[in-house]
Amino acid sequence: MSAGGQRPRRTFVCLSSQRWSDGMWTNKQHVMSRLARDHRVIYVDFGTRPMAEILRRKIGAPEGAPSPAGSSMGRRGWGARLDPLAPVVEERGGVTVLDFPIPRFAEYLPHGSRARAALEFDLRTFALGRWMKTEGLARPVVWVYHPGFGGGVRSLPSSRVVYDCVDEYTTFPEFRGATAWIAGRERELCAVADAVFCTSRPLFDAKAALAPGRVQLVPNVADAAHFERAADPALALPEDVAHLPRPIIGFVGAVSDYKVNLGWLAHLARQRPSWSVVLVGPHAVADPTTDLSQLRALPNVHLVGYRAYEVLPAYLKAFDAVVIPYRLGAATRGIFPLKFFESLASGRPVVISRLPALEAYYPDVLVADDVDSFVNACAAAVALEDDAAARERRVALARRNTWESRIAQMLARLDELDELSAPRSP
């Protein structure tokens, strides 16, 4: 922070674990879109593309004609189009999005293999460094979400390296058989990071030894104002749930077996056949082994699939209670679900499994330890739905935990680091 109290305008380069255009926004897009209001943000897309699509995007448009809409190849025109490592550059709402040409066949290589790491992470880091040099981009804050980038990020010209740790990647299904590799990469990243932010107490405890004195707990939050729209009398209910039998017990999020206890939901539907159980979200994300057959077989379970972020408040308005029935185990020990405060902001009663990261909020929700207590908690939640005072307490709690407050904490830490490293007057 400057002597006049003004925060310096920074440049952030975000090495993400998700595409900017992903319909299910998470920490990455929420944080970077808000940072872009006052700072320059460059967002490096994650993932791969088929070679044919890479070629189409790089050379399929005449000079000066972006392809797709809003994209370009940066400053070098046709030279960049012919450069195999040059990114497609797009401007998205004040954020510069870089999509480097990482070929799709990288995804068929085993996680943890030298070849896959070289293509998916090291090549992207190398290509980013070249682009930064070409663009004259010096000393930005490099903000990392995926630990797979490892210590290689220190090769980038940066003023600071931040690791925003939002998940325990060693438990992800995609890294089964490669947990030692991803853990090693995370150790490398923590060793070079100037600041490590963790979204839950279990994550903080796990990373504290990897970056002594540089780890800070900054829990997940929500866009409370967006989800408070669920209380708007003028907001129409979505047609696919508007006429379902009530009460409606709803879940919003990726329907993946490694996180969501599908057995609990099936048991609830069987025990309460007159109720409706609605699951809003894509299926089998990050876990292709997810089996939804037991849910599909139940007439009162409704798998509506992915819905855009903009319409989620309308679905929450339709629910009589919101559930977050995550499995209890290694994969969820460090999870602080974004949907927690989003659900509270809707005003609806919330039922959760006993997630360690949410322990401080147990008094504000209904907590289930097993399948039978889950059914009982849902019944209790339905009975609470008309309690106006309880509804306002839930909304007030969500309002105290916003993206703006989380970002302010993280920027304050960067300011502290600047002050500590600033030259002292004699």
Placement of each model-derived feature along the sequence:
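Membrane-proximal helix-turn-helix segments that form the acceptor-binding/catalytic region
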Residues: V31, F126-K133, R154, A178-V196
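Nucleotide-activated donor-binding/catalytic signature segment of Leloir-type glycosyltransferases, i.e.
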Residues: G281, T289-P313
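Carbohydrate-associated surface elements
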Residues: P202, V218-A230, F319
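Nucleotide-sugar-dependent
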Residues: D22-T26, S256, E310-Y315, V322-L344, ...
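A charged, aromatic-enriched C-terminal amphipathic alpha-helix characteristic of glycosyltransferases
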Residues: A388-D415
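Conserved donor-binding/catalytic core segment of Leloir-type glycosyltransferases
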Residues: V241-K259
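Acidic anion/phosphate-binding donor-loop and adjacent secondary structure
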Residues: P173-G177, A222-D240
